[in-house]
Swiss-Prot record:
It comes from Neisseria gonorrhoeae. SUPFAM superfamilies: P-loop containing nucleoside triphosphate hydrolases. This is Dephospho-CoA kinase. Pathway: Cofactor biosynthesis; coenzyme A biosynthesis; CoA from (R)-pantothenate: step 5/5. Its main location: cytoplasm. HAMAP family: Dephospho_CoA_kinase (MF_00376). Keywords: ATP-binding, Coenzyme A biosynthesis, Cytoplasm, Kinase, Nucleotide-binding, Transferase. It catalyses: 3'-dephospho-CoA + ATP = ADP + CoA + H(+). It is an enzyme of class 2 (transferase). It holds the Pfam family CoaE. NCBIfam families: dephospho-CoA kinase. Catalyzes the phosphorylation of the 3'-hydroxyl group of dephosphocoenzyme A to form coenzyme A.
Amino acid sequence: MTAWVGLTGGIGSGKSAAAQYFADLRVPRIDADRAAHSLTASDGIALPEIRRLFGDTVFDTQGLLRRDILRKEIFASPSRKALLESVMLPLIFSEIKKQQETFTDAVYGIVEIPLLTEKRQFISLIRRVLTISAPLEKRIGRVMARSGLTRGEVADIISHQASESERLLLADDVLLNDGSLKSLREKTMLLHAFYSGIFASKPTQGKHNG
């Protein structure tokens, strides 16, 4: 039975790069954000309920979800955000579980869940938590470089996420991504060897044995 590691981290921490390095090592990779995107893509199963709750204004004339409009609405209103999460989180959970069931031979796999610290229900899907950590200034710089957002906008996004201390408290393992991509790859390879060893000998190793 494949054991699953929940990979998480704040925006700009490098979690997606780390997840890709695991995938390069032929480790099964599941991405919660991709699952969410598929659920809200054309003909996605979440669309009818989103339309019922949020109305036609968040859809274009072709029936496609206007993600920018919806994002602004939920960012401005905690109650609207909670409403969307009531629709999306159970569907994302089910989609991840379905994808996990397609992997049976791998010793372990990676589930990339950016909001794992905030949404603890996903812990039941994993055995260990790996937090990708990085200094705040590096995180801000990375996001500004790739997105064109201002420093203030990035800082605002970070302020709405879980704190670094909260993520570290949840973690079984921490990867400090404070250097180059080469360094990140090397650290990922060390963790790969570690996980391959512990899960081959003790499949339930870790704090999170859901």
